[in-house]
Curated annotation (Swiss-Prot):
Residues 2-28, 72-89 are cytoplasmic. Component of the ER membrane protein complex (EMC). This is ER membrane protein complex subunit 6. The modification N-acetylalanine is found at residue 2. Residues 45-50, 107-110 are lumenal. It comes from Homo sapiens. Keywords: Acetylation, Endoplasmic reticulum, Membrane, Transmembrane, Transmembrane helix.
């Protein structure tokens, strides 16, 4: 008779260290893109609402690229898709505004 192997019911095993590492990579990507897009917005001279729309477009583009990179097996790397869209969004906004105002002042004011 063949041995019966019982399948484990419940959620798959997830390494907490790997989850933290992936979150750190997402945070690094979001911070880098925020700094780069803020510098770009400052050099282009975007002001007011146009500057914030530029940040929104850069964030959406980054999220789409992250989803494309994760592929169909995103659940192998993340618990949910939400961190790909919203992870580090507010912290990235602060970085964006910092670089945006600094480079706008350097290029267009001085």
């Amino acid at each position: 008779m063949a041995a019966v192997v019982a399948k484990r019911e419940g959620p798959p095993f997830i390494s907490e260290a790997a989850v933290r590492g992936n979150a750190a990579v997402l945070d690094y990507c979001r911070t880098s893109v925020s700094a780069l897009s803020g510098a770009t917005a400052g050099i282009l001279g975007l002001t007011g609402l146009y500057g914030f729309i530029f940040y929104l477009l850069a964030s959406v583009l980054l999220s789409l690229l992250l989803i494309l990179k994760a592929g169909r097996r995103w659940n192998k790397y993340f618990k949910s898709r939400r961190p790909l869209f919203t992870g580090g969004l507010i912290g990235g906004l602060f970085t964006y505004v910092l670089f945006w105002t600094f480079l706008y002042g350097m290029v267009h004011v001085y």
